[in-house]
Amino acid sequence: MAPKKDEKPPTQEAGAEAPAKAERKPKAEKAAKKAKKEPSKKAAKEPKGSGEKKDKKKKKSAVETYKLYIYKVLKQVHPDTGISSKAMSIMNSFINDIFEKVATEASKLSRYNKKPTVTSREIQTAVRLVLPGELAKHAVSEGTKAVTKFTSG
């Protein structure tokens, strides 16, 4: 078993991606001997691959934050004002919480009406229920404007 392990890393290092692609094709086509050898190669590759997948997951979670948009709005409202990372994190959590409340309320409304789909009408009603007074009016008008812009062009 030790010679097999010694043979595999040099082929991976020297060949890089080209041998890996060549090895995957025979596996798809089948071959009992190659199939037995490949799991050990897979085991050697999986930590690297799983590490890359974890990096991709981290990147996806970064995409899900609203930090960039919070910063853009801050600069529109107060161009010479900054924001700390802790304050940015709090604002991001606040937006996530509000969106979750609106989504939950919209889901309840669609269930009450026995409709399988959450439409813009349910979202609008949920916003009116979740947000207080004047804030709800502004949110509804901005949301209506955004939906109109999205559907028209």
From Swiss-Prot:
For this chain, one GO molecular function annotation is:
DNA binding
| Covalent link (Glycyl lysine isopeptide (Lys-Gly) (interchain with G-Cter in ubiquitin)) residue numbers | 149
Describe how it is modified after translation: The N-terminus is blocked. Can be acetylated to form H2BK33ac and H2BK34ac. Acetylated mainly on the ubiquitinated form.
Q: Which GO terms describe its cellular component?
A: nucleosome; nucleus
Entry keywords, A to Z: Acetylation, Chromosome, DNA-binding, Isopeptide bond, Nucleosome core, Nucleus, Ubl conjugation
Q: Which residues carry this modification: N6-acetyllysine?
A: 41-42
* Record's keyword annotation contains Flavoprotein: no
Keyword Acetylation belongs to the record: yes
Its localization reads:
Nucleus; Chromosome
Cross-referenced InterPro entries, in alphabetical order? Histone-fold, Histone_H2A/H2B/H3, Histone_H2B, HISTONE_H2B_site
Question: What top-level branch of life does the organism fall under?
Answer: Eukaryota
Query: Quick one: where's region Disordered?
Result: 1-61
Gene3D superfamilies linked:
Histone, subunit A
- Composition-biased stretches (Basic and acidic residues): 1-10, 20-54
Family per record: Belongs to the histone H2B family.
Q: What does this protein do?
A: Core component of nucleosome. Nucleosomes wrap and compact DNA into chromatin, limiting DNA accessibility to the cellular machineries which require DNA as a template. Histones thereby play a central role in transcription regulation, DNA repair, DNA replication and chromosomal stability. DNA accessibility is regulated via a complex set of post-translational modifications of histones, also called histone code, and nucleosome remodeling.
Quaternary structure, per UniProt, is: The nucleosome is a histone octamer containing two molecules each of H2A, H2B, H3 and H4 assembled in one H3-H4 heterotetramer and two H2A-H2B heterodimers. The octamer wraps approximately 147 bp of DNA.
The protein's name is Histone H2B.1
Organism encoding this protein = Chlamydomonas reinhardtii
What's the source species' lineage?
Answer: Eukaryota, Viridiplantae, Chlorophyta, core chlorophytes, Chlorophyceae
Q: Which gene encodes it?
A: H2B
